[in-house]
A protein has these predicted regions:
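Anaerobic metallocofactor- and corrinoid-dependent redox/one-carbon enzyme cores
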Residues: 2-32, 36-37, 41-45, 51, ...
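Electropositive, gly/pro-rich neighborhoods at or near active sites that engage anionic ligands
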Residues: 44-203, 209
Length: 534
């Protein structure tokens, strides 16, 4: 290819077509992008080697696949050396599956890595469907990885990653062969989200509605960001009785609602807003910052000496906490920095001083009778699921205005970091229920699905017949696998924004419009009018 790189997997991709220059909009270099492609091609080679050798596949190999896919998600790794190490590990693993191939002079292709340039330059519809599969399994790998950290794995899920990778590397497949696999990504991701939900709730308890302050107390503190609850638990244990407060950031906010994490008195509150504001919010911060997963942005000099990474997150010259999970360097840095000398009163983007989280399916379904009665009485006339990823693109204030303008007899269900656009608003209550219910992290889309299905069963109708509208925002690959799950479930008339994915070709988009009624967002006023009149 003439391009120095090609990447169009995130919502902010250059020109809504693809990043092709010296670096991507996310900040990764062209060399990093090429190494991510090489890593993906090596994973496809591993899937080829596993074909027919399934009996030789081990849990260690499965974990390597998850790690490799997770690493290529937007804003996870900017470290070329880490990518090279993973590529080498995959090559060594292939030798265990097909040792004879490495001494064979033939060219059967059994262990060949895949050249991703052939994907980026192929027929646009094939490229589009294979991209949906690839980006979908990247997102799903993150969920499977988090579940595995808590000791939960599923053979069906593990096997599907190989199947999907193999499909991406198959040359002669067209739309007829690829479309079913696209929807299968959604099917398996539903199973994966269910597994992660089970892992989280079994380990930490069923989330309960919890008010979380946005004020930072004086004294030493650590900000933990990302999604990994196990890392948070370990950090809380290691900081007990050390005079250090812990604050969540971004997608870690829902951790406050889990009973076995709430018990730690030094888990104090939430720092700041969504991921795209971190460079401003972390500027000269007098505390340490621990990244457990995405979203990591290029680190600025004003806080680089207090940033730490762990798990698959990696950034050049930043201290990485390895598998031993000894957070001593993070703790020592927090103590040395000392924190703020007096309380710092932070707010949400609308000026609110606190937010509420913890409305998982376990909580919402426990008051299902109350919800159903409110609908029957006419107190609740509509449900909106307004959630997904946040991002920096101008126009995402659409979601703030949509929620502000939603009628007083409607409930807003939300999840993922898109909620930061409005989660500090006070919209009051309906029949004792808050109008805004934060269901959790992006993987807690499973909670929204469970609630929707339960409501449909209660009213003896199809989910699409409920007074329920989905207005979603997307940014990275976890949003892709969630969207595919909704399509697998047959959920229609989803409004998606702020832009449609660059990797959706006109023909594939036409298929989605004709079969599922997907449409781009327009204005809050127009969309509310349309959705409320359906």
């Amino acid at each position: 290819m003439e391009n120095k790189m090609f990447c169009y997997q995130c919502e902010q991709t250059a020109g809504c077509t693809g990043c092709t220059g010296n670096s991507g909009v996310c900040g990764k270099s062209a060399n990093t992008a090429r190494l991510q492609d090489e890593l993906t091609g090596a994973l496809i080679g591993l899937a080829r080697a596993a074909e027919g050798n399934e009996h030789l596949v081990t849990e260690e190999m499965n974990q390597l696949v998850l790690e490799g896919l997770f690493t290529t998600i937007t804003n996870v790794s900017f470290n070329d050396e880490t990518l090279k190490l993973l590529i080498n590990k995959i090559e060594d693993t292939k030798k265990k599956l097909v040792p004879n191939c490495f001494t064979c002079s033939g060219s059967c292709g059994k262990n060949n890595n895949f050249d991703m340039n052939t994907l980026w330059t192929t027929d646009e519809d094939v490229r589009s469907l294979k991209s949906l599969i690839l980006f979908g399994i990247r997102g799903m790998a993150a969920y499977a990885y988090h579940a595995s950290v808590l000791g939960y794995t599923d053979e069906t899920i593990s096997k599907f990653f190989y199947k999907a990778l193999f499909a991406i590397g198959t040359k002669d497949w067209g739309m007829d062969e690829l479309l079913p696999i696209v929807l299968e990504v959604g099917e398996v991701n539903l199973r994966c989200m269910e597994l992660l939900d089970k892992a989280n709730t079994t380990t930490y308890g069923t989330p309960v509605p919890t008010r979380v302050p946005l004020t930072i107390e004086k004294g030493p503190f650590i900000v933990i960001t990302g999604h990994d609850l196990k890392d948070l638990q370990l950090l809380l244990e290691q900081t007990k009785d050390k005079g250090i407060n812990i604050y969540t950031h971004g997608e870690m906010l829902p951790a406050h609602a889990y009973p076995k994490l709430k018990k730690y008195s030094h888990l104090k509150g939430n720092f700041g807003t969504a991921w795209q504001n971190q460079q401003k919010e972390f500027d000269n911060i007098p505390g340490a910052i621990l990244y457990t997963t995405n979203c990591l942005m290029p680190v600025k000099p004003s806080y680089a000496d207090r940033v730490f990474t762990t798990e698959v997150v990696s950034y050049p010259e930043i201290v990485h906490i390895g598998e031993e999970k000894d957070f001593t360097p993070v703790i020592e840095r927090a103590l040395a920095l000392g924190g703020y000398t007096k309380e710092r009163h932070m707010t949400g983007i609308n000026g609110g001083a606190q937010v509420t989280t913890g409305f998982s399916h376990g909580t919402v379904l426990s008051v299902a009778d109350q919800v159903i009665e409110a609908v029957k009485n006419g107190d609740i006339k509509h449900f909106f699921l307004v959630g997904g990823c946040d991002g920096a693109r101008v126009g995402r204030n659409y979601y703030t205005e949509f929620v502000k303008q939603s009628p007083a007899d409607s409930i807003i269900l939300t999840l993922a970091c898109g909620k930061y656009r409005f989660n500090d608003l006070d919209l009051g209550t309906i029949g004792g229920l808050p109008r805004i219910m934060d269901m959790g992290q992006c993987n807690d889309a499973y909670s929204a699905i469970k609630v929707a299905i339960a409501l449909a069963e209660a009213f003896k109708c199809d989910v699409n017949e409920l007074p329920l509208s989905m207005v979603l925002s997307w940014y990275e690959q976890k949003a892709v696998c969630i969207l595919l799950t909704l399509l697998y479930l047959g959920i229609k008339n989803i409004h998606l924004g702020p832009t449609l994915p660059a990797f959706i070709s006109p023909n594939v988009l036409n298929f989605l419009v004709e079969n599922y009624g997907i449409s781009p967002i327009s204005t809050p006023e127009e969309d509310l009018k349309k959705l409320l009149n359906n």
